[in-house]
Swiss-Prot record:
Pfam families: FecCD. It is found in: Cell inner membrane. Keywords: Cell inner membrane, Cell membrane, Membrane, Transmembrane, Transmembrane helix, Transport. GO terms for cellular component: ATP-binding cassette (ABC) transporter complex; BtuCD complex; cobalamin transport complex; membrane; plasma membrane. Part of the ABC transporter complex BtuCDF involved in vitamin B12 import. Involved in the translocation of the substrate across the membrane. It is a multi-pass membrane protein. This is Vitamin B12 import system permease protein BtuC. The chain crosses the membrane at residues 11-35, 57-81, 93-107, 114-138, 142-166, 191-206, 229-249, 258-267, 275-296, 305-324. It comes from Escherichia coli (strain K12).
Length: 326
């Protein structure tokens, strides 16, 4: 038994090391790749200082943090709701952030600065989160809370659709691009949004013990002495914050929060002591690679990153499911 535990521990360490190396390679490639390839030896030349440090680095850091936040949010939701299909958009938090951002674009007639749009997106996500916490205070079961989140998401989606019909052509272009996700407008002015993600990411990665209990189910978690109501509220609030900030940075990006935790579980990473940091590393790597494809796929334009994540990831996910079912 002790030998098996040691073997599992070594395997977990190997997985984390491999994911760390993958993330570093993706980070390096993201800084080098673009319309002009800039090798690390040229990073400190005048051209490198402009393209790498002023343009590519803030974008790369934003992609890394958003990928980590979405993947960890998916892992938290899948444990919290005991549903492998749970992901950041399921509770309506992503759509709530979208409603806040779209309201800011329409009411501000496209004149509001980026920081104001970011605050509105975060406010929309937190409003939906507060509504969910209100439901949670009524001690609803996990399945009912999940259904409440789905209903809120549908309402927010309907509001966004109505907003598109009433928008002008300029606003419509901005809204449609946002709904497909993208990091094209990210620069150092959004650094405050990046910093807002870091403490919550680190805190959640340290909460493996309650997460492991939640993954056992509500009844088992209560029997083990976990204050279920408290942890459910805290985790929903933390997830709402991360998703709101992510939407403010890059718009709506699907697939990462759904598939990354599921893929890692299929690979044997079920302990949240390993799964949570693994999701952060794998989510960051996956979104970095998707962003590189989005930048380089077309010569004259940039693809929406949400389209890239779905196109590249869905076949891999189906293949893994078929492989696991054999």
């Amino acid at each position: 038994m002790l030998t098996l535990a040691r073997q599992q521990q070594r395997q977990n360490i190997r997985w984390l090391l491999c994911l760390s190396v993958l993330m570093l390679l993706a980070l390096l490639l993201s800084l080098c790749a673009g319309e002009q390839w800039i090798s690390p030896g040229d990073w400190f030349t005048p051209r490198g200082e402009l393209f790498v440090w002023q343009i590519r680095l803030p974008r790369t850091l934003a992609v890394l943090l958003v990928g980590a936040a979405l993947a960890i949010s998916g892992a938290v939701m899948q444990a919290l709701f005991e549903n492998p299909l749970a992901e950041p958009g399921l509770l309506g938090v992503s759509n709530g952030a979208g409603v806040g951002l779209i309201a800011a674009v329409l009411l501000g007639q496209g004149q509001l600065p980026n920081w104001a749009l970011g605050l509105c997106a975060i406010a929309g996500a937190l409003i939906i989160t507060l509504i969910l916490l209100r439901f949670a205070r009524r001690h609803l079961s996990t399945s009912r809370l999940l259904l409440a989140g789905v209903a809120l998401g549908i309402i927010c989606s309907a509001l966004m659709t109505w907003a598109i019909y009433f928008s002008t052509s300029v606003d419509l272009r901005q809204l449609m691009y946002w709904m497909m996700g993208g990091f094209g407008g990210v620069d150092w002015r959004q650094s405050w949004l990046m910093l807002a993600l870091i403490p919550v990411l680190l805190w959640i990665c340290c909460q493996s013990r309650p997460m492991n209990m939640l993954a056992l189910g509500e009844i088992s978690a209560r029997q083990l002495g976990l204050p279920l109501w408290f942890w459910r509220n805290v985790l929903v609030a933390a997830t709402g914050w991360m998703v709101g900030v992510s939407v403010a940075l890059a718009g709506a990006i699907g697939f990462i929060g759904l598939v990354i935790p599921h893929i890692l579980r299929l690979c044997g990473l079920t302990d949240h002591r390993v799964l949570l940091p693994g999701c952060a590393l794998a989510g960051a790597s996956a979104l970095l690679l998707a962003d590189i494809v989005a930048r380089l796929a077309l010569a004259a334009a940039e693809l929406p990153i949400g389209v890239v994540t779905a196109t590249l990831g869905a076949p891999v996910f189906i293949w893994l499911l078929l492989k696991a079912g054999r």
